[in-house]
Structure formats: C-alpha cells, structure tokens
Swiss-Prot record:
GO terms for cellular component: lysosomal lumen; lysosome; membrane. Gene3D superfamilies: Aldolase class I, Exo-inulinase, domain 1, Glycosidases. InterPro entries: Aldolase_TIM, GH59_C, GH59_cat, Glyco_hydro_59, Glyco_hydro_59_dom, Glycoside_hydrolase_SF. It comes from Homo sapiens (Human). Hydrolyzes the galactose ester bonds of glycolipids such as galactosylceramide and galactosylsphingosine. Enzyme with very low activity responsible for the lysosomal catabolism of galactosylceramide, a major lipid in myelin, kidney and epithelial cells of small intestine and colon. Belongs to the glycosyl hydrolase 59 family. This is Galactocerebrosidase. Activity is lost after heating at 52 degrees Celsius for five minutes. The gene is GALC.
Length: 685
C-alpha cells in the first residue's frame, strides 16, 4: 500500500469534507491521495498521443415550441435572475449554445411561434420573443453560439401544399431573411442554421441554402443537417460530394449516446442537436449528467443541446417541466432553479467551445463514465458521473439496463498534465434530500507529491468535476416569491400603444397567432385590440387544429365566467368563440374538449363540447354580422353553463359533465382575421 502523503493537510481536508457531508453519513467526501485502499480501476489521462475531437459546447433549445412563452412577462428582478442562471458565465448553467425556433406560425409542441413573414410581402423582425432572448443571452455571454431552426413554415411558402420544398429558392430566401434580419435589426450573428426539425430534408434545398447564404455574404453561417436521425443524411452525404461539402455538422435527436457508422465515416462534426426532454427532477438531472459524458464516449458527439431551455409554459401542456429550470408563474414571480442547471455547470463552467476532448475517455469498471478536456494551454477538466439506471432514464430512447456500484477509481495524469499541482473539486450527489448536494465546491486536491495520481471513492448517482480552473461559482439570488395560482380575476384591455412584445401576456397561442393590433378604423374604445392574424393554414409540424385558439389561466379552474368583446372580420363564413375548461393544448390541441361559445357572421350561435365542434350542446339564430363588435359572456358553474350576447341571455343551465376543469380560451372558426378586446375572467377552482 502506498504511503500517505501530505497527511496533515489531508486530515484537515477530511475533517472539512466530513462536516460538509453533514447528515449524508459519508465519512468525508471521497478524495484519497494516492491511497490504494481497495481494488479498483485505474484510468490514465494523457495527451502524449494527441487529442480527441474538438468540443463545441453544451446548450439548450428555446422553442419547438413556445417553451419560453411565459418568461417574457416575468417582473424584474426575477426575469433577469432566471436569465443569469441560464446564461451568465460561471454562475449557473452557463450555457455555451442557444438554439431557437425560427417561428413559422404553426403548433410545434406547446404552442405556436410567430413567423417574421406571415405573408409573402410581410416582414417584421420584432414578433415573438426569440430575438429578445438571443439578445439577453448575448448580453451575459457575448461568445454564446446562436442556432436557428424551423419547425413549421408560413402557409404561403407551400403554394397550397403542406410542404416547404415546393419552391426551394423561396424557402431558402425566407430562412436567409431571418438570418439577415437578426443582424440588421438586433445585431445578432447567427452561427448555425438548420433545415426542418425532425422532418424530411431535401438535398437540393440544402445546396441552394448554402449558395444563398454565400451570396448574402454569410459564409460564416454553418449548416446543420438534418435534426432527425443519423442514417439518411449520413448516407446521402457519403454518396453526394456536393451535399457532403455544404453540411458542416450532422445533428441527430435523442441518439441514446450512440451515432451511426455512416455518420462517423463522414468525419464531420457530430452533435446531439436535441436531447434530454425529461422532467427536471433528479431523474432528469441524472439523465442529463449521463448523456453529457456518454454522448462523446459512445458516439463522438461534441455538442449536446437540451430541449428545452426553461419550462416557461403552462405545466399541463405536453412535456410539462421538461426544461433545465422552471419559470411558469410570471404572475407571482416564482421560479425554481432545478438540478439540471447544476449538472450542466459541472461541464459548462469548466470548458469552452474550442477545447478538445482527450483520447483517454471511457467507462468506469463498475458503472459510470469519465471524460477529460483541455484548452491546449495547460488547463485540464475531468468530469466523472456514476448515474444509476434507475435515476438516469431519459424520456427516450429506451435505456438498456446497466449496473453501477461503489468503486474506487484511480486517475493518473500523464503527458503535459503530469506536473499539474492542484485540482479544484466540485461535487453533486442526487437522490434523497438527506444525502443530496448540488454543485458543491470541496477542498482542492493537491498532487505535488503524488506522481500525478489520485483515487476517488465513488458511489452511485454522483458527479465530480476536477479542474485546474478556479473560476467556478455556484451563483445565487434571494429566494423568489412563493408559488401562487393564476389570479382568479384577470382582465386585459390590450391598450398598449407601443408593445415591447407582439403578444399579450399570459395568452398561449395553440393554433394561429394572436397579436397586439392598432385598429385605425376605430379611434374609440376598440382602438387597441388583440387580433388573430393568420388567414392561411401554415405548413404544419404537428396536428394543428382547424380553428385558431389561444389559452390562458389556471388548468384547475372549474367554475368561471369569461367575458370578451369580439369582432368578426370575415363576412358570411367568419366566426369566433370564447371557451372555458379547455383540457388539452400543444400537439393535442385538435382533440381539446371544453365548453365553447361560438357566434358566426351568418347570424347563428353554437355551444359545443369540443374545439372541433362535433359535440353540440345548443345552437340557434342570433343577430350577428361581420364588422361589428359584440360582447360574449360564458358562465360555467358545476354541471351547468349559460351564455349571453351583449348582456342578453341566449341559453341557461345547459348540462355539461366533461371536462371538470381547464383553461379559458379565445379563438376563431377558421384561419381568419378577428379581433378581441376587454377580456375578463372570474374563476374559482
């Protein structure tokens, strides 16, 4: 057994770490200098034979869709605090990459994001919130990498087809205008552009996109393809020299830490360009910690990008709380810095794009993995994870069983790292509250007399970072306000002369796009309104409804009264609705149930139990035409509903048994222009 070295200083460190462990019961968090106390694996970290692949960074996706919707109207200082936890270097997640949806007006998981070109002759580079988010990220980290990717496309590009490749030049033009607009209007340099999220790629389109980028002087913008599976795009690149030349990065989604043979044969950069998508509990954190290491070890992926950045959408929408952190209550200011933020920090705070992986990375003998990266200037960062199968399952793909057990692991630094005198140590333990630590700095590890080796005692569900960098920090702010339900009384008159964002607070568009509108034809009460602005179905990514709809409020609302002024713009065929107890949204919006109160320009009304209009509770004639304002009131109490038009009762006490609760909503009968004003909801759970 090797002699104890620096025993006095080690004893002091052991006492400190035992105290830090507290009720965890571990007799000192497990750093043993050259103490081979038990059999275990030995792992050499060496750059003598060169380095591995270049590291491109860790990031997250905003969009795909509307995942940051509720973030924008958080009050200060909480909004800035959330952004700091995500983007500020050496503070929280400290992300290297921000990938955003190029809004295309379609439903793309949890809502729609507006296009910068709703129509062929329409250009507006201030819609939505992704521009704002990219600028906020750049404020905090000027070196952050920016990526744009379309999910859906505005309908005019399809010329009557649900397909973006009808006119390749036109679609390329549309995408390039977004990149040019980002620079012209926001001084944002987009670094990478994608093709069509998780849908078909077109090789000729990719080539045309490259030519158009070059023509616009955007040679620096690189192309990622195809944000889907490895196989097809990799095989196409191997068979098509021109396609091979224009694709810079092969990006795959949810690869399960493995890449395809053809992808590796290309020699191109390989990215997990969307991954994670898991509830941000400690299991989600375990998933994230495992794949951040093993995506490179198993699949040579040099970047991993989480969907999604921050869970800022109503939690009952699909994939609730599948963000690195949670910020879904702008009305209260409450947010939660979830454990995936600190798992991210183990890598992001101690590496940068442009560093290189060592060739000597791999799996631990008794489960877990290790990677090491260097900047080539003497700095070294080692990340070790021992995430158990039970606590590291991602939402997909299926994870084959593996075992992780307690072990001793000896690491030997060789090559240019053999003379490193000291390593900073950061530690995370996931699991029971009594044993849990998140990104805790331990005493540094001295290597002066150890021949560059050290031994760790590793248990399951742990994460270690050992690094020469001294800049790491666990940032913090005072606790945000306590969680509160959505206000039971909520009103909005939309009287905003110069709105900072194009969408009204808390409304979450699920099909169609609802924007602030200045009604120049009405200088009076309805001068400022909320308008549904799409008159054509977009090129869809999901199963958008046939009707447009925007939801708002508390999913647990049971008894409520909704009142809203409405204005149908389309004669004869136009129609609008208000609704309560809407029980579905996102990619499930077509099958939403609820109580929907419709009026139509043809002089009729209808009460339905679903958005599609198949379940009819009541219908009749009413004095309604287009181009005139009306006030609708819908009251739902217990098992009964009543409705009024301009304060005149249309029906009373119609029995409704399902659903029991849900959001409030507004919308239109089809993709048509319509306006809404003086929205009011009064509700109880």
């Amino acid at each position: 057994m090797a002699e104890w070295l620096l025993s006095a200083s080690w004893q002091r460190r052991a006492k400190a770490m035992t105290a830090a462990a507290g009720s965890a019961g571990r007799a000192a968090v497990p750093l043993l200098l050259c103490a081979l106390l038990a059999p275990g694996g030995a792992y050499v970290l060496d750059d003598s034979d060169g380095l591995g692949r270049e590291f491109d960074g860790i990031g997250a996706v905003s969009g795909g869709g509307a995942t940051s919707r509720l973030l924008v109207n958080y009050p200060e200082p909480y909004r800035s605090q959330i952004l700091d936890y995500l983007f500020k270097p050496n503070f929280g997640a400290s992300l290297h990459i921000l990938k955003v949806e190029i809004g295309g007006d379609g439903q793309t998981t949890d809502g729609t994001e507006p296009s910068h070109m709703h129509y062929a002759l329409d250009e507006n580079y201030f819609r939505g919130y992704e521009w704002w988010l990219m600028k906020e990220a750049k404020k905090r980290n000027p070196n952050i990498t920016l990526i744009g990717l379309p999910w859906s496309f505005p309908g005019w590009l399809g010329k009557g087809f649900d397909w973006p490749y009808v006119n390749l030049q036109l679609t390329a033009y549309y995408v390039v205008t977004w990149i040019v607009g980002a620079k012209r209007y926001h001084d944002l340099d987009i670094d990478y552009i994608g093709i069509w999220n998780e849908r078909s790629y077109n090789a000729n389109y990719i080539k045309i996109l490259r030519k158009m980028l070059n023509y616009q002087g955007l040679q620096r913008v690189k192309i990622i393809a195809s944000d889907n599976l490895w196989e097809s795009i990799s095989a196409s690149m191997l068979l098509d020299a021109e396609l091979f030349k224009v694709v810079d990065v092969i990006g795959a989604h949810y690869p399960g830490t493995h890449s395809a043979k053809d992808a590796k044969l290309t020699g191109k950069k390989l990215w997990s360009s969307e991954d994670f998508s898991t509830l941000n509990s400690d299991m989600g954190a375990g998933c994230w910690g495992r794949i951040l290491n093993q995506n490179y070890i198993n699949g040579y992926m040099t970047s991993t990008i989480a969907w999604n950045l921050v869970a800022s959408y109503y939690e009952q929408l699909p994939y609730g709380r599948c963000g690195l952190m949670t910020a879904q209550e702008p009305w209260s200011g409450h947010y939660v810095v979830e454990s995936p933020v600190w798992v991210s920090a183990h890598t992001t705070q101690f590496t940068q794009p442009g560093w290189y992986y060592l060739k000597t990375v791999g799996h631990l003998e008794k489960g877990g993995s290790y990677v090491a990266l260097t900047d080539g200037l003497g700095n070294l960062t080692i990340i070790i994870e021992t995430m158990s199968h039970k606590h590291s399952k991602c939402i997909r793909p299926f994870l084959p069983y593996f075992n992780v057990s307690q072990q001793f692991a000896t690491f030997v630094l060789k090559g240019s790292f053999s003379e490193i005198p000291e390593l900073q140590v950061w530690y995370t333990k996931l699991g029971k509250t009594s044993e849990r630590f998140l990104f805790k700095q331990l005493d540094s590890l001295w290597l002066l007399d150890s021949d560059g080796s050290f031994t760790l005692s590793l248990h399951e569900d742990e994460l270690f970072t050992l690094t020469t960098l001294t800049t790491g920090r666990k940032g913090s702010y005072p606790l945000p306000p306590k969680s509160q339900p959505f206000p039971s009384t909520y009103k909005d008159d939309f009287n905003v002369d110069y709105p900072f964002f194009s969408e009204a607070p808390n409304f979450a568009d699920q099909t169609g796009v609802f924007e602030y509108f200045t009604n120049i034809e009405d200088p009076g009460e309805h001068h400022f309104t909320l308008r549904q602005v799409l008159n054509q179905r977009p090129i869809t990514w999901a199963a958008d409804a046939s009707n447009t709809i925007s939801i708002i409020g508390d999913y647990n609302w049971t008894n409520l009264t909704i009142k809203c002024d409405v204005y149908i713009e389309t004669p004869d065929t136009g129609g609008v609705f208000i609704a309560g107890r809407v029980n579905k949204g996102g990619i499930l919006i077509r099958s939403a149930r609820g109580i929907f109160f419709w009026i139509f320009a043809n002089g009729s009304y209808r009460v339905t139990g679903d958005l599609a209009g198949w379940i009819i509770y009541a219908l009749g004639r009413v004095e309604v035409t287009a181009k005139k304002w009306y006030t609708l009131t819908l009251t739902i109490k217990g098992h009964f509903t009543s409705g009024m038009l301009n304060d005149k009762s249309l029906w009373t006490d119609i029995p409704v048994n399902f659903p029991k609760n849900g959001w409030a909503a507004i919308g239109t009968h089809s993709f048509e222009f319509a306006q809404f004003d003086n929205f009011l909801v009064e509700a109880t759970r």
